[in-house]
């Protein structure tokens, strides 16, 4: 069975208040072309950017799905943290007759479907974005206080035939994956889930993180977003993830680069250099290094870069001012506060745990005692 793995479409999202519907349709048209050679599509959450999606976003998704139905393709979808599970699953029972399978309201177990191909059965399991509170009510005798425990509980209480090939769609953060500032996450890594939760699945189709990447092993895959949804993602390579699942244990995964209507880029340099570049419609963050910046520089750059969304200056003066400011900030911080800043810098913005902080304070007190 061949399938296309997508996630984090975020239909209706804006980039610094700029509407991206046209850009989103451009990449979805490419997905439709790819789907002509696939058996089914899986979408691992965050179809929309907001729980109450705009009319434009819903119309775009309806067009996309309708085009795939014309191709007689099966479609499997789970909701993400940006979606409203109830809204996304509205009319889901009717849509199944059109081979569209959307995760229903959470009931404490995986929602599973079986398909057949030349190698036998394939089971596709749907796991929408869940939080511990979503699962507690279904298992009152089990202590479920972490995302890890919530997912382990759902999977262990679901009927899974490990002898067959199993695909799971999920929308969670797997420990060790790289984040960007476009994604929501919890301080201290409270939403972390270990990859071992998904042991036994032949392919784990993940959503939630925008960078296309595998975690722990090749078959635990984040498809990533098709577009760059912040300038922090400007260096990311966006891909369509195409999977060819043959007999159990034999999987080929291919990444097809996405073509953008307008790229999201950061450019920097001196005004005289940037003003003489070839005009572009890309979405740009422009940083000037000139020591003196004329009041008309921004407007003149707009003539070359009509989609310049961010404009800034970095020169010897601004760097000096920034370094002085940082020095003043750090001089007024306690050791434990400095440790938290350093830890967050090294761990994708995650906070140290209470146990780690207690250990640090213990060491600080020991050092103070030795110095007295």
Predicted region positions:
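Short, conserved loop/helix-junction motifs that constitute active-site signature segments
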Residues: 69-71, 160-162, 196-200, 277-279, ...
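Divalent metal-coordination and catalytic microenvironments
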Residues: 8, 28, 46, 61, ...
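N-terminal active-site segment of His-dependent metallophosphoesterases
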Residues: 1-65, 355, 359-366, 370-371
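Conserved beta-strand segments of alpha/beta enzyme cores
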Residues: 2, 74, 101, 123, ...
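Accessory, non-catalytic peripheral segments of nucleic-acid enzymes
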Residues: 40, 245-372
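A conserved active-site cap/scaffold subdomain adjacent to cofactor or substrate pockets
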Residues: 195, 202-258
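His/Asp/Glu-rich metal-coordinating catalytic cores
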Residues: 53-54, 60, 76-216
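Short coil/turn segments at beta-strand junctions that form active-site/ligand-binding loops
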Residues: 1, 39, 73-74, 120, ...
């Amino acid at each position: 069975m061949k399938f296309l793995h997508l996630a984090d479409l975020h239909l209706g999202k804006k980039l610094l208040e700029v509407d991206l519907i046209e850009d989103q349709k451009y990449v979805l048209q490419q997905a439709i072309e790819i789907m002509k050679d696939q058996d089914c599509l899986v979408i691992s959450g965050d179809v929309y950017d907001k729980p109450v999606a705009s009319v434009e976003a819903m119309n775009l998704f309806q067009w996309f799905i309708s085009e795939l139905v014309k191709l007689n393709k099966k479609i499997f979808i789970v909701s993400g943290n940006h979606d409203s599970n109830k809204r996304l699953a509205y009319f889901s029972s009717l849509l199944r007759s059109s081979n569209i399978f959307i995760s229903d309201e959470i009931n404490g177990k995986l929602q599973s479907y079986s398909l057949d191909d030349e190698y036998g059965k394939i089971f596709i399991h749907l796991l929408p974005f869940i939080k511990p509170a979503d699962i507690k009510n279904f298992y009152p005798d089990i202590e479920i206080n972490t995302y890890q425990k919530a997912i382990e509980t759902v999977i262990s209480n679901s009927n899974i035939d490990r002898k067959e090939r199993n695909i799971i769609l999920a929308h969670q953060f797997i420990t060790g994956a790289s984040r960007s500032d476009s994604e929501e996450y919890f301080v201290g890594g409270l939403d972390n889930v270990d990859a071992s939760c998904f042991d036994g699945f032949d392919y784990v189709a993940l959503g939630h993180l925008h960078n296309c990447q595998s975690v722990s092993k090749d078959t635990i895959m984040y498809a990533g977003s098709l577009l760059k949804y912040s300038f922090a993602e400007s260096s990311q390579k966006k891909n369509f993830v195409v999977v060819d699942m043959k007999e159990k244990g034999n999987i080929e995964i291919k990444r097809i680069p996405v073509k953008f209507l307008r790229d999201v880029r950061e450019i920097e340099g001196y005004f005289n250099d940037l003003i003489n570049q070839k005009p572009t419609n890309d979405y740009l963050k422009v940083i000037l290094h000139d020591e003196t910046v004329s009041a008309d520089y921004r407007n003149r750059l707009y003539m070359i870069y009509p989609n310049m969304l961010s404009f800034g200056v970095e020169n010897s003066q601004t760097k000096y001012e920034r370094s002085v400011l940082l020095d003043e900030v750090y001089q007024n911080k306690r050791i434990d506060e400095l440790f938290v800043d350093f830890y967050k810098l090294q761990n994708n913005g995650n906070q140290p745990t209470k146990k780690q902080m207690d250990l640090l304070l213990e060491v600080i007190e020991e050092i103070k005692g030795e110095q007295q």
